[in-house]
């Protein structure tokens, strides 16, 4: 019950974001190996925004060590996913930080995404455009993922 209230509060605050949005936020929830592979793809995402627009990549905390593989333009934010799921105060803190970025575009780059983490972070940005891959069938989360489709552009 508290998780739903927390998510509703995050969604409400995201909807009240400020007007002039710019930049890109990408959520890449894989492990270190996935982050290494994603470093080869980030340039394609960067082309979605202007040369002067900020680019932020959210990764699992343990993937911050491969940050040197990404262009200097990319700001990495590490998130402890287990703590994000279990600790409401931490979740609100992370979501407030993402909302403060005031991005134009937010993307969840994973085919296997968690509705309790990836979707919440993308929604929390209040971005004008929100994108995600169609999720792979996942019986445990199918219902929530289907409900969250309305959040995306």
Q: Could you say what each language-model-derived stretch is?
A:
Residues 1-153:
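Catalytic machinery of carbohydrate-active enzymes
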């Amino acid at each position: 019950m508290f998780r739903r209230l927390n998510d509703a509060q995050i969604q409400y605050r995201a909807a009240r974001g400020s007007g002039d949005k710019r930049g890109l936020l990408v959520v890449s929830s894989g492990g270190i190996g996935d982050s290494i592979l994603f470093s080869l793809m980030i340039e394609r995402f960067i082309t979605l925004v202007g040369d002067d627009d900020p680019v932020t990549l959210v990764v699992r905390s343990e993937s911050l060590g491969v940050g040197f593989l990404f262009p200097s333009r990319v700001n990495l934010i590490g998130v402890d996913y287990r703590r994000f799921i279990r600790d409401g105060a931490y979740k609100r803190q992370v979501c407030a930080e993402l909302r403060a970025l005031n991005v134009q575009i937010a993307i969840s780059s994973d085919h296997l995404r968690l509705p309790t983490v990836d979707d919440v972070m993308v929604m929390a940005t209040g971005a004008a455009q929100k994108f995600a891959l169609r999720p792979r069938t996942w019986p445990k989360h199918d219902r929530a993922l289907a409900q969250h489709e309305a959040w995306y552009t």
